[in-house]
Amino acid sequence: MSGPNWLLDTNVVIGLLKGNKPAIDLAEDVQLDLRRIAVSQITRMELLGFQSLDASEEDHIRRFLGCCHVILLDEQIEELAIRIRRSTGLKLPDAIISATSIIKSLSLLTLDAELLDRTTRYQATR
């Protein structure tokens, strides 16, 4: 087995953890192999940073994250995220997640069609 081929957006992880149909359907549509998934460091921070997270939810999230490759931010991701944010107006976490998928050559799995639409030109230049 090789490394990851999908980067999961935070909304997909939340959906999968909660058993939401749109996230599950998306994962099934792409035949997602949970052994080949990654998340951005920012997704990990978003998931574990919820203020009302109880111990059981945190444990559930940590177990899921334990199955994922967590991609740490580096200078290349930072630079592209800045360019994406400045040119598209995306929220910084979305720009970071998008930049991570592009720099690491991973397919981004998201329920946010706007995120994909607004970053298409960056994906085409890699």
What are these regions (language model features)?
Residues 1-4, 98-126:
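Acidic, PIN/NYN-like endoribonuclease modules and their adjacent C-terminal/linker elements
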Residues 1-39, 49-62:
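Short, well-structured N-terminal submotif of metal-dependent ribonuclease cores
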Residues 9-10, 47, 81, 101:
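Generic structural signal for small/hydrophobic residues in well-ordered secondary structure
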Residues 12-13, 43, 77, 96-97, ...:
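Alpha-helix capping/helix-boundary segments
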Residues 33-34, 67-68, 104:
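Structured helix-beta-strand junction loops
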Residues 66-87:
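Acidic catalytic patch
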Residues 86, 90, 106:
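Short glycine/serine/threonine/alanine-rich loop segments
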